[in-house]
Structure formats: C-alpha cells, structure tokens
C-alpha cells in the first residue's frame, strides 16, 4: 500500500526505453545499451483479479437488478467496396506501408493522417486533402499521397445501399432507427438525410447546436412529430439520454473511442425498455482499416467486460494490452494480415445478451460475398544505420 511503484512493477505495465549504439564495425559483437527512461502505462495483470478482487468484490450489472431487460446483440455487417474504390484504397495503403518501411521518421509523423484517410476513404471516396511531408515546406514538392476523387455525394456507395435496405426492413417491422456517424469532416449526415427523405422516410439530424440538457426533450418532440430515423454523432448521446423509442441502432462508421462506443450503443438497452430486443449494427468495409479497427474494438470490449465481472479468456488476455488503437492499427496494417469476417462476427456474438428470446439476429442476408485471395506487396525491412537507436520494451507482470 505504501509502495505504489513496487505494486506497479508486480501487477502493472512498465515501458522501458533503451538506447543502443550500433555501428557497422561492431554489428556482431555485444553493443552498448543503456536505459534512458521508464514509465508506467495503463494496463493491469490478470493476476490482480484472482489475487485481490474475486473474493472481495461484487460485480453488478443491469441484468442483476431483477428487472426484465430485452435481448441485446451487436451485429457487424460487412460491405464490399466498388472495384475502382478498392484499387485506389490499395494504392493508398501500399504507399503508407512503403513509407513506414523506408522512411519511418516521416511515416510516424503522418501516421494519424493516413489512418484517418484509410478509415474514411471507403465511405466517401472524394473530397479528401492530400497528405504532405511535414519536413518539406514547399507545397508543390511535399505531397506524399493525393487521393483520387471517385464519384460524388450524389452517388450511392455499397454501404449506403446496405444501410437503406436495413432501415427499410426495420421500418416495415414497426421499429425506429438511430444512425450514428463519427467522421465530422465528412458530409455523411446531410447525405444520409437526403437519401432517406428521397425515399419518403421522415428523418431528423441531432447536432451539437442542441444544448445538452435539451437533447432528450428535443428527441421526444421529434418522435411525437413522426420521425422514424434519427441521425447523430455518437459522441452527442454517449451519456445521460434514454432513447427507448429507437430499438435498432446502426453505426454507419465508428470512431476509435471505446468509451463513446459502449455508451452510445446502450442508449436503448435500459430497464424501462419494453421492446423484446435491441440490435446494434456496425457497418464496415471488409478487409479495410474499418475492419481492423472493429476487430480491435471487439478485443478491447472483451477486456472492458472483465471490469464488470464478465470474465473471459479473450478479456483477460487483452487486459495488459495498453497500446492505443491508433498505434495498434498501424501495426496491423504493416503486418498485412487479412481479417476473417466470420471470426469478427463470432467475437461480437460472444458478448450478446439473450434472456427470453434466444433467436439469431436477422442479418444473414448481409453475409459478406466471397472475395479473391489478397495479394500483398512485399515490404522490405528497414535498414539499420550506424547511429544510436531508441526502442521501447514493454513488460506486463
């Protein structure tokens, strides 16, 4: 208790940074290494639960309150990019891989911009700014990638078609739908509102202009006016709102924020919900950055449920994983591994909550089509120069 550092060394995650002098003359001999600094990172060893918490803690959730709750399931829906969009996406992805391999100094500086571009481009393959070399001031000489514009806001993308089809089916079943969007720089909300209006669906956009304390009243008023689809950013409803009138929640795209996702996805799964089931759909393009991000989110969600007493092997394994999603996505992209759609669906299926209505979600019609085997471009290893290098070593005790 009085030695927090010793406790963290035993049960936490420690990052140790070293400097190693390597030259071409002593590459085969023992190089000089010295510790530069160390710091503790967010993360905890699974031993903490068996040693300190299991016999001394009570985990409560809504299921334990003695109230009748609806079934709850999160369902990933894969989509397939248009061929011309996929071609440009692959070019952008390979450019980033090449940059990280050959020019890691530049790659690390533009990593966030590239990951955001690779996440947003499949949804909106137009209107993106070029990615520039931060070390070259001349704008006519510093362009690293200039995404091609394919189509416009008037063109339907495959994800749009899946979304409209799903909304149409849910409205025919008498449900109301929430559509969450996350990319604030895209015109997604206005586009979707226009598409729904043209199909005769009454929709409304909840934006940040509505004060926080008035949002629930604003939503109730729109429901009484006959609104069937609510479009909003998930960050605007993450806390404090009960949206029981909407029993189908669709994430058109997802930001890399686990807390916001968990809060927004539970807005309708409340104690006073009278519907038999609440379904959460997550739309993504298969074998893209969206796919990788969603798979990492599933792993993080599994770890988060351990805190609530829902212990699983996957959750325990992810507890000591302290890296942020951006860093993990970059590593996943460099590895070049193809994700499995069925594995992703199974990961979310494990976290579903079924009580009195144990039936599979009606999402089979959106199963991913067969795709040709991916051909990955070879990525050469970075060349070690005869200069001092720094590296990070993580150890979870």
Language-model regions: role of each:
Residues 1-132, 173, 280, 294-303:
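Inter-lobe coupling linker of SF2 helicases/translocases
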């Amino acid at each position: 208790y009085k030695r927090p550092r010793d406790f963290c060394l035993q049960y936490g995650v420690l990052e140790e940074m070293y400097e190693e002098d390597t030259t071409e003359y002593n590459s085969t001999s023992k190089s000089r290494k010295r510790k530069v600094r160390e710091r503790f990172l967010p993360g905890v060893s699974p031993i903490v639960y068996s040693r300190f918490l299991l016999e001394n803690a009570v985990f409560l959730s809504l299921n334990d309150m003695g109230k009748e709750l609806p079934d709850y399931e999160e369902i990933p829906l894969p989509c397939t990019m248009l061929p011309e969009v996929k071609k440009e996406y692959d070019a952008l992805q390979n450019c980033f891989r090449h940059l990280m391999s050959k020019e890691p100094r530049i790659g690390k500086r533009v990593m966030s911009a590239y990951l955001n571009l690779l996440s947003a481009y499949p949804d909106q393959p137009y209107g993106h700014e070029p990615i520039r070399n931060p070390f070259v001031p001349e704008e006519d000489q510093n362009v690293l990638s200039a995404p091609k514009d394919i189509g416009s806001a008037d063109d339907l993308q495959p994800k749009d078609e899946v979304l409209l089809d799903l909304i149409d089916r849910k409205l025919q079943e008498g449900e109301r739908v929430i559509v969450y969007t996350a990319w604030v720089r895209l015109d997604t909300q206005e586009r979707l509102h226009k598409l729904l209006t043209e199909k005769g669906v009454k929709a409304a956009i909840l934006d940040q202009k509505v004060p926080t304390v008035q949002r629930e009243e604003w939503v109730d008023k729109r429901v009484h006016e006959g609104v069937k689809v609510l479009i909003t950013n998930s960050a605007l409803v993450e806390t404090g709102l009960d949206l029981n009138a909407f029993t189908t929640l669709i994430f058109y795209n997802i930001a890399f924020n686990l807390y916001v996702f968990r809060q927004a996805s539970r807005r309708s799964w409340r104690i006073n919900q009278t519907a038999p089931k609440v379904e959460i759909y997550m739309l993504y393009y298969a074998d893209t950055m969206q796919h990788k991000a969603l798979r990492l989110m599933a792993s993080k969600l599994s770890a988060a449920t351990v805190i609530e007493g829902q212990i699983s092997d996957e959750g325990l394994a992810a507890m000591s994983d302290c890296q942020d999603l951006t860093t993990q996505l970059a590593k996943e992209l460099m590895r070049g591994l193809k994700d499995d759609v069925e594995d992703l669906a199974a990961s979310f299926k494990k976290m579903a909550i079924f009580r009195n209505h144990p039936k599979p979600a009606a999402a089979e019609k959106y199963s991913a089509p067969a795709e040709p085997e991916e051909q990955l471009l070879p990525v050469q290893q970075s060349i070690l120069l005869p200069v001092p290098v720094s590296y990070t070593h993580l150890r979870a005790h």
